[in-house]
């Protein structure tokens, strides 16, 4: 039977004898939240420190409503200590810090592997921290996009994140093919916002014999849809396709089992739900089944060579088995430490716990949005109050913590009014606002405050404004 977090919320409201739309119920949910203390692990922005806030409308000493962890996660409190310790070591030891003292720099990536492998459902040999997301997509397409006269196409979701599109287009063009013809895109049906799994599978079945790579997002950046990765991967591989995933909006947000799902490769950034800071080091996954296939082409560098011989400066490339063999250069130490500070927080809980809270938190946001601002609501029917439409799938298994919404009034105006009141989120043009309460540091009270804030913003906006 499908899990329905909205039903759980209603049962808890009934059990507590509290009105589900009341602030008291939100506070009750926070009091029962096993992750409630995780917020203390992060620096949380205050209203008065944000640009564009109108302090005549809001208490500047309050916490902001930060629903933008899908764009940039908050700073873990442990970051500064780790960075300061390494700066001090650099100050005191210079180059000797590579091999001596606290947390030697030479094997720095090792401090990231086990916790990241746990988060994505992988083995240690399958995971590496390196580069940035789009760079890693290119690095992975060297071995895994190898077109032939018979198989040369790439299958993607329509309106994928632009950088993914550019990477795929440039790879197709580099190999002498036509991106306009040889990248197949799957779009939602007319009148629908999300892709149906059956339509993705139909495209694989129809074009599979000419497709060499299926490259999708785990969670779609615009709509927030969480694709059925296991089913899509199996169907594509059955047709002889390689399968890769951009997990930028999935890692740290939804449960992943990349090894068990037999995914060929995946790439992700770490500055969203993994809270590694702006431009933080990215991650990559290469399935164990490819670990010892040293014949796969790659763009090689010395950090992908065997550690025991790396500094012997041999001409021969002795590839490290697994994902680590795809490294080119030594990773940026301070970026690794920033990510480690966040992984320390993740190790105090589990993705299962994070996902469980995220389901409830997002369901509560959805419930309140529909209660007050649904197009069919009696309040909005009179035409004087703007209404909200949610384009993210309603089924919790088909989404993470992000809800993408559209308004009956200009999104820029709504966003401006929210920002005046201490909201941090983002808009994606032409007309979507992304609202993403992050389970590690957001609360049910945050959700309730946001709804009150949205109501106040709507009161300043007329339907024709």
UniProtKB/Swiss-Prot annotation:
The terms describing its cellular component in GO are: cytoplasm
Reaction catalyzed: L-kynurenine + H2O = anthranilate + L-alanine + H(+); 3-hydroxy-L-kynurenine + H2O = 3-hydroxyanthranilate + L-alanine + H(+)
What are the recorded Gene Ontology BP terms? 'de novo' NAD biosynthetic process from L-tryptophan; anthranilate metabolic process; L-kynurenine catabolic process; L-tryptophan catabolic process to kynurenine; quinolinate biosynthetic process
Q: What EC number(s) would the UniProt record show?
A: 3.7.1.3
Q: Which cofactor does it need?
A: pyridoxal 5'-phosphate
| Residues recorded with modification N6-(pyridoxal phosphate)lysine | 272
Q: Which UniProt keywords apply?
A: Cytoplasm, Hydrolase, Pyridine nucleotide biosynthesis, Pyridoxal phosphate
Q: Can you tell which superkingdom this protein's organism belongs to?
A: Eukaryota
Q: Could you confirm whether the keyword Protein biosynthesis appears in this record?
A: no
Q: Which residues bind pyridoxal 5'-phosphate?
A: 133-134, 161-164, 217, 246, 249, 271, 302, 330
Q: Record keywords: Magnesium included?
A: no
Q: What is its main location?
A: cytoplasm
Which pathway does the UniProt entry assign to this protein?
Amino-acid degradation; L-kynurenine degradation; L-alanine and anthranilate from L-kynurenine: step 1/1; Cofactor biosynthesis; NAD(+) biosynthesis; quinolinate from L-kynurenine: step 2/3
Q: Where in the cell is it found?
A: Cytoplasm
UniProt xrefs under Pfam families: Aminotran_5, KYNU_C
Supply one GO molecular-function term: pyridoxal phosphate binding
> What is stated as this protein's family in its record?
Belongs to the kynureninase family.
> What is the recorded function of this protein according to its Swiss-Prot or TrEMBL entry?
Catalyzes the cleavage of L-kynurenine (L-Kyn) and L-3-hydroxykynurenine (L-3OHKyn) into anthranilic acid (AA) and 3-hydroxyanthranilic acid (3-OHAA), respectively.
Q: Which PANTHER family match?
A: KYNURENINASE
- Read off the HAMAP family from this record: Kynureninase
Q: How does it assemble?
A: Homodimer.
What name does this protein carry? Kynureninase
The gene designation is kynu
């Amino acid at each position: 039977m499908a899990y329905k977090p909205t039903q759980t919320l209603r049962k808890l409201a009934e059990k507590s004898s509290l009105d589900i739309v009341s602030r008291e119920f939100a506070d009750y949910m926070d009091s029962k939240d096993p992750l409630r203390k995780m917020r203390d692990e992060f620096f949380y922005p205050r209203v008065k420190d944000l640009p564009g806030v109108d302090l005549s409308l809001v208490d500047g000493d309050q916490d902001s409503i930060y629903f933008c962890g899908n764009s940039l996660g908050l700073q873990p409190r442990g970051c500064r200590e780790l960075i300061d310790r390494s700066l001090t070591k650099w100050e005191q030891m210079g180059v000797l810090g590579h091999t001596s003292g606290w947390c030697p720099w030479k094997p720095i990536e090792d401090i990231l592997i086990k916790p990241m492998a746990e988060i994505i459902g992988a083995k240690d040999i399958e995971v590496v921290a390196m580069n940035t997301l789009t760079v890693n997509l290119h690095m992975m397409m060297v071995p895994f996009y190898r077109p032939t006269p018979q198989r040369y196409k790439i299958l993607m979701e329509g309106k994928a994140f632009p950088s993914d599109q550019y990477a795929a287009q440039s790879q197709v063009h580099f190999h002498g093919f036509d991106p306009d013809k040889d990248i197949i895109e799957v779009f939602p049906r007319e009148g629908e916002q999300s892709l149906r799994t059956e339509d993705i599978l139909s495209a694989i079945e129809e074009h599979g014999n000419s497709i060499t790579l299926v490259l999708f997002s785990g969670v779609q950046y615009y709509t927030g849809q969480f694709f059925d990765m296991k089913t899509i991967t199996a169907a594509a591989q059955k047709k002889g396709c390689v399968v890769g995933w951009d997990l930028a909006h999935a890692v740290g947000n939804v449960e992943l089992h990349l090894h068990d799902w037999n995914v060929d490769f995946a790439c992700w950034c770490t500055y969203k739900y993994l809270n590694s800071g702006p431009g933080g080091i990215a991650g990559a996954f290469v399935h164990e089944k490819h670990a010892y296939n040293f014949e796969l082409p790659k763009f090689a560098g010395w950090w992908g060579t065997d550690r025991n011989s790396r500094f012997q400066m041999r001409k021969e490339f002795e590839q490290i088995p697994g994902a680590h063999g795809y490294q080119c250069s030594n990773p940026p130490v301070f970026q690794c430490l920033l990510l480690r500070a966040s992984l320390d927080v993740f190790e105090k809980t589990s993705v299962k716990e994070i996902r469980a809270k995220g389901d409830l938190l997002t369901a509560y946001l959805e419930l309140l949005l529909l209660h007050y601002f649904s197009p069919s609501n009696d309040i909005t029917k009179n035409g004087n109050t703007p209404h909200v439409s949610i384009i993210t799938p309603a089924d919790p298994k088909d989404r993470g913590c992000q809800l993408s919404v559209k308004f009956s009034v200009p999104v820029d105006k709504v966003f401006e009014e929210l920002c005046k009141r201490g909201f941090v989120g983002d808009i994606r043009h032409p007309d979507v606002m992304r609202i993403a309460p992050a389970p590690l540091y957001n609360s049910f009270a945050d959700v309730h405050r946001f709804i009150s804030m949205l109501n106040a913003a709507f009161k300043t906006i007329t339907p024709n404004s």
